[in-house]
């Protein structure tokens, strides 16, 4: 009996028209059937936001053998949720890949990123997931290294799987990488986050800007990416601080 083909779901937070998702999907096609379900426009910084008070729409944009494209009016996580409940209702995809994001999602960016947020939804749905981000914010940029590494890691995931509550976040430097390194996420934060300005009527407005710094001691994904390496960080869905949990229990006992 002929085995079912591999099914790959692809999403992002830059929108279905973005260069990154188009080139990623094309690179993944030799691995199996590829289905894009992505926002109908940019949704950067959407994190794990969902739409709960408005209806969302799913629109078929393109279909050919082994390759289908849908746009969704919701957030990146909406896209994955809706895909699981419609397109993949009868059979879950074998792999979820998000990106390629135009801009890195290293360090503290993981909690803000729609690209990572969409991949985390894969953990919720028990689907192995990989988020791919390139350290280049240009609308048109060289995606060749990012897509090549994405395919390499996707093959590894399809062969070996991932823990049920863990996804992988990949950050690719601009230019030719020195190699691939597994690492922790940098314990960072943003400084100088907003630039003050005025609108046409003289009212104060603020533009998001800023830069990320390492507030910890671990050399993580941000530093290694800046040093020229492709970084690969395992991220858990369950955010419980298990190290602090027994401490909390003891403190509560004392406070009674």
From Swiss-Prot:
Binds 1 divalent metal cation per subunit. SUPFAM superfamilies: SurE-like. Its main location: cytoplasm. GO terms for cellular component: cytoplasm. It is found in: Cytoplasm. Gene3D superfamilies: Survival protein SurE-like phosphatase/nucleotidase. A divalent metal cation binds at residues 13-14, 44, 101. GO terms for molecular function: 3'-nucleotidase activity; 5'-nucleotidase activity; exopolyphosphatase activity; metal ion binding; nucleotide binding. It holds the Pfam family SurE. It comes from the Bacteria. Its EC number is 3.1.3.5. Keywords: Cytoplasm, Hydrolase, Metal-binding, Nucleotide-binding. It is an enzyme of class 3 (hydrolase). Belongs to the SurE nucleotidase family. Nucleotidase that shows phosphatase activity on nucleoside 5'-monophosphates. This is 5'-nucleotidase SurE. The gene is surE.
């Amino acid at each position: 009996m002929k085995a079912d083909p591999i099914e790959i779901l692809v999403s992002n937070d830059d929108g279905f028209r973005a260069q990154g998702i188009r080139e990623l999907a094309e690179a993944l096609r030799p691995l199996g059937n590829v289905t894009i379900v992505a926002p109908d426009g940019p949704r950067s910084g959407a994190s794990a936001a969902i739409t709960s008070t408005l209806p969302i729409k799913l629109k078929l944009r393109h279909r050919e053998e082994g390759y289908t494209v849908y746009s969704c009016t919701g957030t990146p996580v909406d896209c994955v949720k809706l895909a699981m409940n419609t397109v993949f209702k009868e059979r879950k995809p074998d792999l979820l890949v998000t990106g390629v994001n135009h801009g890195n999602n290293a360090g503290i960016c993981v909690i803000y990123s729609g690209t990572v947020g969409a991949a985390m939804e894969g953990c919720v749905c028990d689907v192995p997931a990989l988020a791919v981000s390139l350290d280049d914010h240009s609308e048109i940029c060289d995606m060749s290294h990012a897509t090549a590494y994405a395919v390499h890691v996707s093959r590894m995931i399809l062969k070996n799987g991932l823990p049920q509550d863990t996804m992988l976040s990949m950050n690719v430097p601009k230019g030719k990488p020195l190699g691939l390194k597994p690492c922790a996420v940098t314990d960072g934060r943003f400084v100088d986050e907003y630039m003050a300005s005025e609108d046409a009527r003289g009212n104060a407005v603020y533009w998001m800007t800023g830069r990320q710094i390492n507030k910890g001691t671990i050399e993580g994904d941000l530093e290694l990416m800046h040093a020229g390496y492709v970084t690969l960080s395992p991220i858990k869905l369950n955010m419980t601080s298990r190290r602090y949990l027994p401490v909390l229990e003891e403190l509560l006992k004392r406070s009674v």
